[in-house]
């Protein structure tokens, strides 16, 4: 029995992101969490849903028997499905738009047309280092509900996932270190307590405290706080490096 199947839900000749071929929405079978937002449906030329029957309802290869590995394997299957496409948007089923302002997406589309990239995230937590007035590089990435991934990068990720027996977390283990983001969070998710939430790395109570303090368990505008903190961490890193270099110079004297 095939544990995954696909359904096309929209096609357009006037996508918001002209440099993206396809959007794949990763959804559990029988889930009602996805909001059929016309903006999401028109992000790219074609939008499909990948339905996942789940490891409890459908026996999967590689002994997939826990939530974290099932999430990684689900991305792996989506990468297999999209082998013939160039840039692809991947959205988890609870992803939703924070900002609809078209000019933000136009800047992202222009960036993709002029620059090589591996992964662009529409909203993540991490350490942000400024590239220019609009874009940041992301280290220590967490949260992967909405990203654009290039064709070459998907091939590399699929191999790494399989070689690693689908262990780890999609964002922290596989996406980290090659990610860029826009200056504002654009496509976000809320973080109610779920089975997947309870499988995250790190201290569960610290994770939960951060979610409550930022408000992203109930209000998507809390992502503004996450982005402010992520940018601040990037600035602090630069300050730490400068202090280290100054101390090193004085030590050598």
PLM feature segments, named:
Residues 1-91, 95-253:
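An acidic/histidine-cluster motif and surrounding catalytic segment
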């Amino acid at each position: 029995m095939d544990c995954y199947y696909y359904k096309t839900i929209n096609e357009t000749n006037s996508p918001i992101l002209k440099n993206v071929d396809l959007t794949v929405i990763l959804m559990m079978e029988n889930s009602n969490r996805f909001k059929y937002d016309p903006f999401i449906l028109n992000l790219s030329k074609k939008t499909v849903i990948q339905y996942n029957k789940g490891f409890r309802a459908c026996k999967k290869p590689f002994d997939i028997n826990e939530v974290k590995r099932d999430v990684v394997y689900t991305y792996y299957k989506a990468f297999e499905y999209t082998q013939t496409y160039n840039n692809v948007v991947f959205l988890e089923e609870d992803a939703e738009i924070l900002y609809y302002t078209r000019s933000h997406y136009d800047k992202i589309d222009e960036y993709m047309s002029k620059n090589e990239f591996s992964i662009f995230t529409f909203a993540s937590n991490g350490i942000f280092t400024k590239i220019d007035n609009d874009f940041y590089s992301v280290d220590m990435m967490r949260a992967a509900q909405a990203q654009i991934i290039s064709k070459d990068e998907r091939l590399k990720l699929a191999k790494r996932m399989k070689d690693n027996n689908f262990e780890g977390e999609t964002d922290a283990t596989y996406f980290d270190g090659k990610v860029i983001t826009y200056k504002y969070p654009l496509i976000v998710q809320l973080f109610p307590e779920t089975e997947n939430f309870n499988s995250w790395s790190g201290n569960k109570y610290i994770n939960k405290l951060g979610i409550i303090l930022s408000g992203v368990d109930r209000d998507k505008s809390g992502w503004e706080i996450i982005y402010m903190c992520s940018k601040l961490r990037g600035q602090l890193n630069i300050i730490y490096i400068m202090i280290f270099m100054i101390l090193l110079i004085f030590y050598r004297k």
